[in-house]
Amino acid sequence: MAAPSAPRPPRPRKEPQPLVIPRNAAEEQRLRLERLMRNPEKTVPIPEKLNEWAPRPPPEFVRDVMGSSAGAGSGEFHVYRHLRRREYQRQDFMDAMAEKQRLDEEFQKKLERNKMIAEEQTAKRRRKRQKLKEKKLQAKKNKLEQKKQEKESDQSQERVSSEDDEEDSKEEEEKEDDAEEPSFVMGRG
């Protein structure tokens, strides 16, 4: 018998989780992610993709059976019936796969068409934005040039006015000089 050992320490109790009922798929997914992230070391079972059902390939060799004619025996009829059922099943499967493939191709074409339309609209909007940007830049340049021209014209006007002032002051000085030396005296004859 085993020797009596010291009693085991009690396991740490897990906190009871509140019962949360997801209202929609997004909330359910969020809850699952939270549950997974509580213990990131735990491995997550990822289910394998189930193989799609496919009918058996047609038999390579078919015995000559009488089929559903009146002279056929019951065993031969059952063989014929099973072969016929499998062939119909295979044809139905091939038709369904062709339809699925056609729908997938249409869907891909539709996606491509929608993508092209979206790219065209984006390009159109981009051109419009670029044009507006260029227009704003041009307006800004014109405004700066106009300000420069105004400054230059103001400076040239100041120069001209200063030159005019200098000429006026010279003329005034000359007039003052003229006033000192009258060319004629009024009242003298």
From Swiss-Prot:
<feature type="compositionally biased region" description="Basic and acidic residues">
    <location>
        <begin position="25"/>
        <end position="41"/>
    </location>
</feature>
<dbReference type="Pfam" id="PF06658">
    <property type="entry name" value="DUF1168"/>
</dbReference>
<feature type="region of interest" description="Required for nuclear localization">
    <location>
        <begin position="124"/>
        <end position="136"/>
    </location>
</feature>
<keyword id="KW-0539">Nucleus</keyword>
<dbReference type="GO" id="GO:0019901">
    <property type="term" value="F:protein kinase binding"/>
</dbReference>
<feature type="compositionally biased region" description="Basic residues">
    <location>
        <begin position="124"/>
        <end position="141"/>
    </location>
</feature>
<dbReference type="InterPro" id="IPR009548">
    <property type="entry name" value="Prkrip1"/>
</dbReference>
<keyword id="KW-0175">Coiled coil</keyword>
<comment type="subunit">
    <text>Component of the pre-catalytic and post-catalytic spliceosome complexes.</text>
</comment>
<dbReference type="GO" id="GO:0005730">
    <property type="term" value="C:nucleolus"/>
</dbReference>
<feature type="compositionally biased region" description="Basic and acidic residues">
    <location>
        <begin position="142"/>
        <end position="162"/>
    </location>
</feature>
<keyword id="KW-0508">mRNA splicing</keyword>
<dbReference type="GO" id="GO:0008380">
    <property type="term" value="P:RNA splicing"/>
</dbReference>
<feature type="coiled-coil region">
    <location>
        <begin position="89"/>
        <end position="181"/>
    </location>
</feature>
<dbReference type="GO" id="GO:0006397">
    <property type="term" value="P:mRNA processing"/>
</dbReference>
<feature type="compositionally biased region" description="Acidic residues">
    <location>
        <begin position="163"/>
        <end position="181"/>
    </location>
</feature>
<feature type="compositionally biased region" description="Basic and acidic residues">
    <location>
        <begin position="113"/>
        <end position="123"/>
    </location>
</feature>
<feature type="region of interest" description="Disordered">
    <location>
        <begin position="113"/>
        <end position="189"/>
    </location>
</feature>
<feature type="region of interest" description="Disordered">
    <location>
        <begin position="1"/>
        <end position="56"/>
    </location>
</feature>
<dbReference type="GO" id="GO:0005681">
    <property type="term" value="C:spliceosomal complex"/>
</dbReference>
<protein>
    <recommendedName>
        <fullName>PRKR-interacting protein 1 homolog</fullName>
    </recommendedName>
</protein>
<comment type="similarity">
    <text>Belongs to the PRKRIP1 family.</text>
</comment>
<keyword id="KW-0747">Spliceosome</keyword>
<keyword id="KW-0507">mRNA processing</keyword>
<feature type="region of interest" description="Required for RNA-binding">
    <location>
        <begin position="49"/>
        <end position="141"/>
    </location>
</feature>
<dbReference type="GO" id="GO:0003014">
    <property type="term" value="P:renal system process"/>
</dbReference>
<dbReference type="GO" id="GO:0003725">
    <property type="term" value="F:double-stranded RNA binding"/>
</dbReference>
<comment type="function">
    <text>Required for pre-mRNA splicing as component of the spliceosome. Binds double-stranded RNA.</text>
</comment>
<dbReference type="GO" id="GO:0004860">
    <property type="term" value="F:protein kinase inhibitor activity"/>
</dbReference>
